[in-house]
C-alpha cells in the first residue's frame, strides 16, 4: 500500500520507535520531513539524522534522544493536519502546546518553523504537528 501522507508516516514511525526505545529509525526522504527533523534537532527532541541511499531511494536515519534513565525526549508527537483535513492558523490564534512546554510545527510562507517563530515573525500557516 502506498503512503499518501509522508509526514504522518514519519510521525508514527518516530512515536513507535521512541516507545520501544530504539536508537534510530529509518524514514523516507522528503523536503518537509527533513525540515521537520531540523526543528526536532534544534529543539533537542532528536540527536540528529543522516541521509543515505538504498537501491536508488533516499532515506533519513533519525537518531532518537533519551535522558540518562532511557526515557524518550519525545513524550507525544501528534499530526494536526492530514491530507483530508488541513488546519490553518493565523499568528494571533497560534495554539500553545502543554502550556508552553511543547512545540508546534507550522508550514508557513517562511518555510517550516515552530509556532513561537511564527508568532515572532507574525506569519500564520498550516499546523503540521505538535511535540512534547
From Swiss-Prot:
Keyword set, alphabetical order: Ribonucleoprotein, Ribosomal protein, RNA-binding, rRNA-binding
SUPFAM superfamilies: Ribosomal protein S8 (SSF56047)
The organism's place on the tree of life at top rank: Bacteria
Entry GO terms, CC: ribonucleoprotein complex; ribosome
InterPro entries the record matches: Ribosomal_uS8, Ribosomal_uS8_CS, Ribosomal_uS8_sf
Gene3D superfamilies from the UniProt entry: 3.30.1370.30, 3.30.1490.10
Pfam families for the chain: Ribosomal_S8 (PF00410)
Molecular-function GO term, any one: structural constituent of ribosome
GO biological process, any: translation
Protein family according to the UniProt entry: Belongs to the universal ribosomal protein uS8 family.
Assembly information from the UniProt record: Part of the 30S ribosomal subunit. Contacts proteins S5 and S12.
Known function: One of the primary rRNA binding proteins, it binds directly to 16S rRNA central domain where it helps coordinate assembly of the platform of the 30S subunit.
Protein name per UniProt: Small ribosomal subunit protein uS8
Organism of origin: Borrelia hermsii (strain HS1 / DAH)
Lineage of producing organism: Bacteria, Pseudomonadati, Spirochaetota, Spirochaetia, Spirochaetales
Amino acid at each position: 500500500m502506498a503512503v499518501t501522507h509522508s509526514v504522518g508516516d514519519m510521525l508514527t514511525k518516530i512515536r513507535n520507535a521512541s516507545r520501544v526505545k530504539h536508537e534510530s529509525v529509518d524514514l523516507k526522504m522528503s523536503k518537509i520531513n527533513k525540515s521537520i527533523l531540523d526543528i526536532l534537532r534544534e529543539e533537542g527532541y532528536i540527536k540528529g539524522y543522516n541521509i543515505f541511499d538504498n537501491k536508488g531511494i533516499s532515506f533519513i536515519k533519525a537518531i532518537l534522544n533519551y535522558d540518562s534513565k532511557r526515557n524518550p525526549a519525545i513524550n507525544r508527537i501528534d499530526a494536526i493536519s492530514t491530507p483530508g483535513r488541513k488546519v490553518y492558523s493565523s499568528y494571533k490564534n497560534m495554539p500553545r502546546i502543554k502550556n508552553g512546554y511543547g512545540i508546534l510545527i507550522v508550514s508557513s510562507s517562511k518555510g517550516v518553523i515552530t509556532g513561537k517563530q511564527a508568532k515572532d515573525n507574525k506569519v500564520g500557516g498550516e499546523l503540521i504537528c505538535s511535540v512534547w
